[in-house]
Amino acid sequence: MKIQLIAVGTKMPKWVEEGFQEYRRRFPHDMPLELVEITAGKRGKNADIARILQKEGEAMLAAVPKGNRIVTLDIPGKRWDTEELAVQLESWKLDGRDVSILIGGPEGLAPACKAAADQSWSLSPLTLPHPLVRVVMAESLYRAWSITTNHPYHRE
C-alpha cells in the first residue's frame, strides 16, 4: 500500500522539508510515503477565496490516482489516538487500495474534496500551521506503522 499526502503549498521552510524527509525515508519499501504539493492560489486583499478553494480542490482531486481511498484532514473529522491510527492503517492495508490524504491550505479544503472523501480525520481541535502538519503526519503514520509491525520505535 502506498500512502500519498496531497498538500496545498510549495516552497516549505528547510526544517519542514528535513522533518518530512526524515520520516519518509524510514517507511518500508512496501508502504512508501509520497508527498504531492499543490500550488496555492494567490491570496490577496480582494481574492475570491471560494474560487481559490475550488481550484485547489480540483488540483488535489486530479492528483489522486483512480481507486485510491481518500482521507481528508479536517477539524470536524474523526480523532484517532496513536493505537487507533495503527488500527486504521491495518484496515487500509486490508482494503487493498492505496491511500491519498488531503491537506488543505489556509482556508481548509474545498467542498468537493470533503464530498469525495471516504474518511475525514482530525489531527487536533487546534488549528495547526500547514507546514507543521506535514511533519506531524509523517511521524504519526510512521509511528502507527511501527505499532503494526512491533518495531521498537513506539514505546508505551
Swiss-Prot record:
Belongs to the RNA methyltransferase RlmH family. Keywords: Cytoplasm, Methyltransferase, rRNA processing, S-adenosyl-L-methionine, Transferase. It catalyses: pseudouridine(1915) in 23S rRNA + S-adenosyl-L-methionine = N(3)-methylpseudouridine(1915) in 23S rRNA + S-adenosyl-L-homocysteine + H(+). This is Ribosomal RNA large subunit methyltransferase H. Homodimer. CDD domains: RlmH-like (cd18081). Specifically methylates the pseudouridine at position 1915 (m3Psi1915) in 23S rRNA. Its EC number is 2.1.1.177. Signal peptide: none annotated. It is an enzyme of class 2 (transferase). One of its GO terms (cellular component) is cytoplasm. Its main location: cytoplasm. It is found in: Cytoplasm. It comes from Vibrio cholerae serotype O1 (strain ATCC 39315 / El Tor Inaba N16961). GO terms for molecular function: rRNA (pseudouridine-N3-)-methyltransferase activity. S-adenosyl-L-methionine binds at residues 73, 104, 123-128. HAMAP family: 23SrRNA_methyltr_H. The gene is rlmH.
